[in-house]
Amino acid sequence: MRREIMLVLLVLLLGTAAHAFAGEAILTVKAGETLHAMSQTLYGVFFEDINHAADGGLYAELLNNRSFEQENLLDPQRFDHYTGWQFNFGGGKGKIALQEEEPLNANNPHYVRFTVSEAGYQAANAGFGASTVTGGISVKSGMTYDFYVWLRSADYTGTVTAALMDRQGTLYSDVLTFTPGEEWTRYTGLLNADVPEGTQAAYLVFTFNGTGTVDLDMASLMPADRIGSTWPGGGVRRDLTEALKALHPRFLRFPGGCVAEGSYVRSNFYNWKDTVGPVEERKENYNTWGYMQSYGLGFYEYFCLCEEIGALPLPVVHAGLLCQSREAQEAPIPMDELDAYVQDVLDLIEFARGGTDTVWGALRAEMGHPEPFDLRWLAIGNENWGDVYFKRYAVISEAVKEAWPDITTIVAAGPVADNSSAWSVIRSRYADSMVDEHYYMDSDWFPAHVSRYDSYPRTTQVFLGEYAAHEEAVSGRRPNNLYSALCEAAYLTGIERNSDVVAMCCYAPLLARSGMDQWTPDLIWFDADSVLLTPNYYIQQMFSATLGTSVVSSELSGAELYQVATRTGNCLYVKVVNLSGEPCRLTLLLDQVPDGEASLLMLSGESAAVNSFAAPETVTPVSEVRPVSAGVLTDTLPGYAAAIYSIPLE
Ligand code: AHR
């Protein structure tokens, strides 16, 4: 009775207050009326080494082109084997020569020979740029850095030192001293940084204090404070890893994107075997976004990263085809030569899951992880289409299913939202695969298509592997503004409502180093020192942190809002998005909900608002509480807002 009286009062109240709000809405939620179970792997992240996401980004290596393998077959003017290095940095006299004879190993064929004629000659690595405007490496006082370098000498007399210093030679760390021997040897040490306040970026500087010839290869500098320092690749940047973890990702899709495929020439295929084993033996390759991949963040490290951030691994392998979006490229692997590649794919699964008595399982154990990784899915192909793709997909996925029947293979549905022709092939031939959809659309497309999955047959599971709301570019870059994030939020209400058919989804791309980006928008921006979280990031985080176990009945009347209601055993989540610029008075009518307090997490602001390095908290979620009484919660949603109410059910 009390509830009925409240409702009558409420309706009267809404009537009298109508002039104050452009919108009013009543959302009736029946927590006891379950519609379907929700996918427990719905939200994840998609990592690709685009925008220097890996090298110069998540990968903890601070030196750029540490092993002189940098080259770009497509654009030789852009990079060369000396990229990132400066020679004749200080005094002394010497010559340098790029060498290939008797290298460190066959996979790491280039090194630099220093022929020093006057002691004091210096060479320096400038890192990836301490900021968007200056070169150098950002090092911090009081921090320790792990360093190593491979050296060899036949006739050198004297020592080689390594230290951090500025461009003028002011020391920023202690000095490590090595006496190179006749064989390639790895020399290691710790550098403790002491950087005066407000000074410039540092360089890692080698000083040749003797004369003669020294060969140098594979130098490395990583902050001791990183995650994964025992991984053979060396580990990942702590702040970025923590930002990923805070998204509560259920899975990690890697290593691309187009990167997983490679472009133009078959030697550019992403070969997972090149990315495992001792780090100095990994065979580098340039990536499709124009720079070199050191592979220090390789497949082993990706699997470890998954464990670190609490995500399940979702590797993508190419389907014997280079990135089809790029034209004028080498032909795919012929069908009658596919066997060797199929074996590579099976070897990858063995690497992840095989016993330590198998060849690849043994390598995994040797690298530090005897236990298998929890590999459940394998995507074969990225953005592919046509018979040329499906024929190869069929062969590879059949082989996988035969050897590992519990692994779900994922088939690509091409690069566009209008993918019905791909779906008709898939439904007729590969209905038991999961289907990877990709689409980047104007922001307004997303709310307009919130019902996209309502009509999808429930027989085949969808993986929305890449999506993002695109705004018009400003100065060449599409902004990560609040409006785009809210359009994604509106769309996610539709995804959640259809999470019986959409099993997984992830925003793309994930990371971008400021000033070194090739693609916008991106979920997380960073520079040498800081991490910038976008409004789009916060939406992903808010939705992922409040993943229900089932979708419950909800019905909206009144103003146009986007909404979904889900629940766990003891909590009801109501997600509401207001895409209009006007506030809306919202009434939640809730059954089976005790009196108490709901917590509210809300992202709102100016539609064009963005976060920037100068003002990183312009758009951040705020937490508040709202009373729930007699099954009613009333609130005023601001214009341009996404709100998530977490309402205790007991
Ligand atoms: O996410 C950026 C790129 O977009 C991916 O590499 C590719 O799959 C898509 O075209």
Write out the residue ranges for each language-model feature.
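Bacterial N-terminal signal peptides
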Residues: 8-16
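Extracellular and organelle-lumenal recognition/adhesion modules and their flexible linkers in secreted
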Residues: 23-294, 312, 327-339, 382, ...
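Conserved, mostly hydrophobic/aromatic
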Residues: 45, 149, 248, 306, ...
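An active-site-proximal structural segment forming one wall of the substrate-binding cleft
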Residues: 191-196, 201-203, 232-249, 295-309, ...
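Active-site groove signature of glycoside hydrolases
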Residues: 255-258, 319-320, 324, 354-388, ...
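Catalytic-core region of carbohydrate-active enzymes that cleave or remodel glycosidic bonds
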Residues: 398-401, 405-408, 426-427, 434-546, ...
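Carbohydrate-binding surface patches
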Residues: 560-595, 600-605, 640-646
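Acidic, Ser/Thr/Pro-rich beta/coil linker or hinge segments at domain junctions
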Residues: 594-633, 637
